[in-house]
Regions:
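Catalytic machinery of carbohydrate-active enzymes
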Residues: 1-341
Length: 341
């Protein structure tokens, strides 16, 4: 039923308490009729012989066109739509509004747990602010804040969202067809998902990373990452990483393993740092990882967040990508996959 669906959505998106019940501050000039876009579209309707029509201004698609007396309308769509709202009382139009973000306070709240997915979104934030000329703020619920501040200092960060803004977006990535997500993310490259969610049909230019620390050594080095969010993404060829590390060292490179953990257990597998790699594992700030990758000769990793950071700082990425399709993440000419295993 409706209550179950709303609670399911709130839990899935890790949304703040009160998002469904919070006061709608947007006045319409008609008593009791209030509108904002802090959870898709939110509209309070007073008692009376009202008819509400909600549509997509750009396509003309009608989402809702019914008579209603009292209550609150919520849309589940968590992506950019140029909403058009028309309200009639006794068949006379009393209110009409088309979503317009220009000059308005707008929040984007990231509840995505994996920082690689967040990194894929980042270039679209600046572009979204530029296109709509809105007062954009971003809320992150993971450890990317310091790195984002370095890359996009013009975008303020906030600790929590409130509901007195004009609009709030909750980007999500799902491997399924739910109405509040525009697409199953397996159907397009990750570096296009942010554009689809925020209504941008091109890939923006990445921010230019400026290192905040010098190289950890004057010798040439390569960074590697043998772990991912799940061990099924990892390279499971027996002794494969040891072969790679030995080869790189014979070429004169130092090899730094920069995973969070020296050992990761899951999915029936144990993934360990290669013995020949120098141990730079640990829960280090992402800005520190970004600096290390910026100064590295190149990076060898998986379909994981560290690959996204490497790409963000223009460190060449050699991606062992058998878990995902060749087009799924970002473009790199250095992809290694054996589709027979």
């Amino acid at each position: 039923d409706q209550v179950f669906l709303l609670e399911y959505i709130k839990d899935l998106l890790k949304m703040p308490e009160g998002v469904f019940e919070a006061k709608i501050w947007g006045e319409t000039g008609f008593p009791g009729l209030r509108l904002d876009f802090n959870f898709g579209l939110r509209l309070d309707i007073p008692e009376g012989n009202f008819r509400v029509k909600i549509s997509d201004f750009d396509s003309g698609m009608v989402f809702f066109d019914k008579h209603i007396s009292g209550g609150r309308l919520l849309s589940v769509d968590q992506y950019f739509i140029r909403w058009q709202v028309e309200v009639f009382l006794d068949d006379e139009k009393i209110f009409s509004h088309v979503l317009n973000l220009e000059g308005q306070p707008v929040n984007i709240m990231f509840r995505i747990p994996t920082f690689g997915d967040v990194m894929a979104f980042l270039p679209y934030l600046r572009e979204f602010k530029k296109i709509h000329r809105c007062k954009l703020s971003v809320c992150f619920k993971n450890n990317v804040g310091e790195l984002v501040s370095q890359l996009y200092p013009e975008i303020p960060q906030i600790d929590e969202v409130n509901f007195d803004t004009y609009a709030t977006y909750y980007p999500i990535m799902l491997m399924s067809d739910f109405p509040f997500a525009l697409v199953d993310i397996r159907h397009l490259p990750m570096n296009r998902v942010g554009g689809l969610v925020l209504g941008i049909d091109y890939i923006p230019t990445k921010a230019v990373f400026k290192p905040t620390e010098p190289p950890v050594t004057d010798e040439p080095y390569v960074c590697i990452s043998v772990q991912a969010s799940i061990n099924r993404k990892c390279w499971l060829y027996p002794g494969g990483w040891d072969i790679v590390v030995d080869y790189l060292k014979n070429l004169g490179y130092r090899v730094f393993c920069i995973d969070r953990e020296a050992e990761q257990v899951g999915d029936g597998f144990t993934i360990r740092k290669p013995e020949g790699a120098e141990d730079f594992t640990g829960n280090h700030p992402l800005i520190e990882r970004a600096n290390m990758l910026y100064h590295a000769e190149f990076f060898i990793g998986l379909s994981s967040g560290l690959s996204w950071i490497a790409d963000t700082v223009d460190c060449p990425v050699v991606m062992i990508c058998g878990f995902s399709q060749d087009w799924f993440e970002f473009y790199t000419p250095y992809r290694v996959a054996n589709r027979l295993v």
